[in-house]
């Protein structure tokens, strides 16, 4: 359940970012080229960094990489809300991308760690249901909150949920990476 809720909240960020970030950047008087560049920073950072973070999770474990990644995502959203120009928005987007890269491949690895091959596809399907539901939940939650309270409030709500999701992982999830027992060195 810790992995599924983290997947939902991770994609909730996407639903918010895709819908609200461009509006937020336009409201901050960014031109179309700047908005396009800023919109690309988050997924580009995420895409490149996950090439490394997936392998990193094979060495350091899953739990704390997921929890820390959720917190980095929350910080990235907060930086975007607090920023007043292109450099700050870009920094927040990059942080959101790094945090997402820490979480995205690691969540799937955690499922693979615990699911027996005979039911792995079913467990991945259940996880993907919850994860992908996050897109819709994020778009709806962010949109309704933005309409009622404004763009910054909606973004803070998503940042807070993301931070709490990291806490849920930190407090409830058990480490799923099983390490091979150390082998004795011959002659030692």
Residue positions per predicted region:
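Intracellular juxtamembrane helix-capping segments at the cytosolic ends
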Residues: 102-115
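Structural signature of the two symmetry-related core transmembrane helices
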Residues: 64-79, 159
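Paired small-residue
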Residues: 76, 87-95
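Short amphipathic helix-loop junctions that connect adjacent transmembrane helices
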Residues: 19-34
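Residue-level signature of mid-helix packing/kink "hotspots" within the transmembrane helices
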Residues: 43-51, 135-136
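Helix-to-loop junctions at the C-terminal end of transmembrane segments
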Residues: 49-61, 146-147
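Pair of pore-lining "gating" transmembrane helices in MFS-fold secondary transporters
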Residues: 1-16, 94
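A membrane-interface helix-boundary motif in multi-pass transporters
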Residues: 144-162
């Amino acid at each position: 359940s810790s992995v599924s809720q983290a997947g939902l909240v991770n994609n909730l960020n996407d639903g918010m970012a895709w819908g609200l970030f461009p509006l937020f950047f336009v409201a901050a008087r960014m031109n179309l080229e700047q908005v396009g560049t800023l919109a690309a920073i988050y997924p580009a950072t995420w895409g490149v960094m996950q090439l490394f973070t997936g392998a990193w999770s094979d060495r350091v474990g899953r739990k704390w990489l997921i929890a820390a990644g959720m917190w980095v995502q929350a910080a990235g959203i907060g930086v975007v809300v607090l920023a007043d120009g292109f450099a700050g928005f870009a920094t927040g987007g990059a942080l959101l991308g790094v945090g997402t890269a820490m979480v995205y491949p690691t969540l799937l690895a955690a499922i693979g760690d615990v699911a027996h091959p005979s039911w792995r596809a079913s467990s991945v399907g259940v996880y993907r249901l919850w994860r992908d539901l996050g897109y819709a939940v994020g778009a709806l939650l962010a949109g309704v909150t933005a309409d009622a309270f404004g763009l910054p409030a909606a973004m803070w709500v998503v940042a807070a949920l993301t931070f709490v999701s990291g806490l849920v992982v930190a407090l409830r999830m058990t480490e799923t990476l099983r390490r091979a027992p150390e082998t004795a060195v011959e002659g030692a």
